[in-house]
């Protein structure tokens, strides 16, 4: 017997299986099936009056429930207000408050309950969460896992609350035989009885007007016989059942009921009063489908038990057992569980203690928390001179060497002096010189070599040759030596297909006398090879002619035309190893004795800007040390 009050906490504007008292103010009604304990107030005068003046109130149910309801003339006034819904078909419903115009939208899905013909469960999805109302249901173990609309993709939906049928949620009804097992026991008893003679008759003592149609259809198919019932009105629009029932008394299987306030003869136990045509007495047995009686048994019994000389009890349940309810709740694992029925001999507190371990908080499953995806991160652009087909992009190796920082000349670190061209008022702007220092940025590359941008195009070679001609025009001074080795290296570079790195970054040693070394020390900086870092490049424009002060490793293989494209990436590696910094002083002393041909040549000597001060070796030494160690270098002006 249902004790559900009709309202759900999440959606209080909806009433289910209860149509009296506070439910009269509901915006919509839902009927799970047509059993009387779920139809209280459905034909009441107050609800009938409300429907007369309402334009929006509807009753939602299944198609079978609609036909069963309207087959009774007392519910005919609902005909214009019933909206049947398909099974397993989500439907959007607007709940409108006629007094204020407020609207609430929910999506409802009807799921098969297996209780009786037309019985359904209602799954509500809306702003207040997902809620399931089962009504009366009989589901076997594992049926919940086969219901598509209880799932979202591969997981069970996040169900906030379940209002569940707990008719037999009692350990004494731990396991109830399945309907198939009960049907098999009843069929065997009927077959053994009616096959004896045409005068052997079976009466199914069913207490409800409908709900046993499962028995009727299966027995009719098994024995090719129709079942006698009192009326066919409720089955007229259900052809799958109508073909197995009849009002003809001349049949061996009866399911007719005793009329109220009508006496019947004791000698004839059939409610319809049927007798044999020739007057021979009928041999009648009664079979009473029951569940509670079997639940009270302490010993294991068969599904059919003989009670007397001609009466039997057969186990047949319309409600799920304790094990089946537990399996259902354990699978969907709702946050809240509310019982719809208080079992005989139990209290609400008893049910609460039994249901508490099945709630999500206690069943061990974590609560589902929905989080936003978050902001997408942009990919970091990698600065590298390697080609797109470089193996470094395909494979990552953990380097055992100390991590080094990669610095580009044009983009990452450079110290450049911009000087205005000489003009009439050039003296007033002699001090308009600035150093531009780019912040050091560590690189993810750990390769221990120097990158160099080169061009092997024929057009570039022609341009280099054209620009080298005017540069060679001024005759060398008597104290300078011709750079024969430099010319030879340029010619051999173009002919070589796979040059070695040593040709690019190691300058050939030229031994000179002490006087030449002393003259060149004051005007030239240390080479990159000797200092393990690259010195700042100074660019000056004087008399509209550009001359470039370059390191010895670059001047060995790059022509004057290459100095115009110094914006290209020319990277060096700054090692953080302290051992390199310790050898800085020793290498500086060796630099005084080892000079390349390009450093000796006076063509690259630049006159100092008027008013400027030539950096002292001590200042440059400190600058080189900071660059080699990867420390930040503070830009300052040189006056």
Swiss-Prot record:
GO terms classed as biological process: DNA recombination; double-strand break repair via nonhomologous end joining; interstrand cross-link repair; telomere maintenance
Compositional bias annotation for Low complexity: 548-560
Coiled coil start-end: none
Molecular-function annotations in GO: 5'-3' DNA exonuclease activity; damaged DNA binding; endonuclease activity
Amino acid composition bias (Acidic residues), ranges on this chain: 454-466
Name listed for the protein in its UniProt record: Protein artemis
Organism from which the protein derives: Danio rerio
Function: May have a role in the processing of DNA double strand breaks (DSBs) prior to their repair by the non homologous end joining (NHEJ) pathway. Probably exhibits both exonuclease and endonuclease activity.
Entry keywords, A to Z: DNA damage, DNA recombination, DNA repair, Endonuclease, Exonuclease, Hydrolase, Nuclease, Nucleus
Domain of life: Eukaryota
Similarity remark: Belongs to the DNA repair metallo-beta-lactamase (DRMBL) family.
EC number(s) recorded for this UniProt protein: 3.1.-.-
Annotated region described as Disordered, given as residue ranges: 450-496, 515-570, 590-617
GO CC entries: nonhomologous end joining complex; nucleus
Record InterPro entries: DRMBL, RibonucZ/Hydroxyglut_hydro
């Amino acid at each position: 017997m249902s004790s559900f009050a009709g309202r759900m906490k999440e959606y209080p504007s909806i009433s289910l299986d209860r149509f009296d008292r506070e439910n009269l103010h509901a915006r919509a009604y839902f009927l799970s099936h047509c059993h009387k304990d779920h139809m209280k107030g459905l034909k009441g005068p107050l609800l009938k009056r409300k429907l007369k003046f309402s334009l929006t109130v509807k009753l939602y149910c299944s198609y079978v429930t609609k036909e069963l309801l309207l087959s009774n003339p007392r519910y005919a006034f609902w005909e214009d207000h019933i909206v049947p819904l398909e099974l397993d078909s989500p439907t959007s419903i607007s709940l409108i408050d006629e007094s204020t115009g407020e609207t609430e939208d929910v999506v409802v899905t009807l799921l098969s309950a297996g209780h009786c013909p037309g019985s359904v469960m209602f799954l509500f999805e809306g702003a207040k969460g997902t809620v399931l109302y089962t009504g009366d249901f009989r589901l076997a173990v594992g049926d919940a896992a086969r219901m598509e609309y209880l799932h979202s993709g591969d997981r069970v939906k996040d169900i906030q609350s379940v209002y569940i049928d707990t008719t037999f949620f009692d350990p004494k009804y731990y396991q109830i035989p399945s309907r198939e097992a009960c049907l098999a026991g009843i069929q065997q008893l009927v077959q053994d009885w009616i096959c004896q003679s045409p005068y052997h008759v079976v009466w199914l003592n069913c207490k409800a007007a409908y709900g046993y149609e499962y028995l009727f259809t299966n027995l009719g198919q098994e024995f090719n016989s129709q079942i006698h019932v009192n009326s066919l009105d409720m089955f007229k629009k259900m052809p799958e059942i109508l073909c197995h029932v009849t009002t003809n008394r001349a049949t061996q299987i009866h399911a007719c009921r005793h009329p109220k306030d009508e006496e019947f003869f004791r000698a004839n136990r059939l409610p319809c009063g049927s007798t044999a045509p020739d007057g021979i007495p009928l041999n009648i047995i009664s079979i009473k489908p029951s569940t509670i009686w079997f639940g009270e048994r302490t010993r294991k019994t068969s599904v059919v038990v003989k009670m007397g000389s001609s009466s039997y009890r057969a186990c047949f349940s319309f409600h799920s057992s304790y094990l089946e309810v537990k399996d259902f709740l354990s699978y969907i694992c709702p946050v809240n569980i509310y019982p719809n029925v208080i079992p005989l001999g139990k209290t609400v507190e008893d049910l609460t203690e039994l249901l508490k371990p099945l709630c999500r908080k206690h069943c061990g499953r974590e609560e589902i928390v929905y989080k936003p995806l978050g902001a997408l991160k942009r990919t970091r652009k990698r600065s590298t001179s390697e080609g797109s087909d470089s193996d470094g992009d395909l494979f990552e190796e953990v380097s055992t060497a100390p991590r080094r920082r990669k610095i580009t000349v044009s983009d990452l670190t450079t110290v450049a002096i911009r000087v205005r061209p000489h003009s009439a008022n050039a003296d007033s702007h002699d001090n308009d010189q600035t150093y531009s220092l780019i912040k050091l940025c560590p690189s993810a590359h750990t390769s221990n070599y120097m990158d160099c941008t080169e061009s092997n195009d024929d057009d570039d070679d022609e341009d280099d040759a054209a620009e080298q001609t005017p540069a060679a025009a001024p005759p060398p001074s008597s104290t300078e030596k011709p750079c024969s080795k430099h010319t030879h290296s340029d010619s051999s570079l173009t002919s070589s297909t796979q040059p070695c790195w040593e040709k690019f970054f190691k300058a050939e040693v030229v031994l000179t006398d002490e006087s030449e070394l002393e003259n060149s020390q004051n005007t030239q900086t240390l080479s990159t090879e000797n200092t393990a870092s690259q010195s700042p490049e100074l660019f000056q424009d004087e008399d509209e002619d550009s001359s470039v002060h370059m390191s010895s490793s670059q001047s060995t293989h790059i022509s004057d035309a290459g100095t115009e494209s110094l914006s290209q990436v020319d990277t060096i590696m700054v090692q953080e190893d302290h051992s390199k910094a310790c050898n800085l002083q020793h290498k500086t002393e060796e630099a005084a004795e080892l000079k390349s041909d390009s450093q000796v040549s006076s063509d690259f000597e630049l006159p100092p800007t008027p008013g400027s001060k030539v950096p002292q070796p001590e200042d440059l030494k400190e600058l080189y040390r900071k660059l080699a160690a990867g420390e930040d270098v503070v830009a300052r002006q040189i006056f």
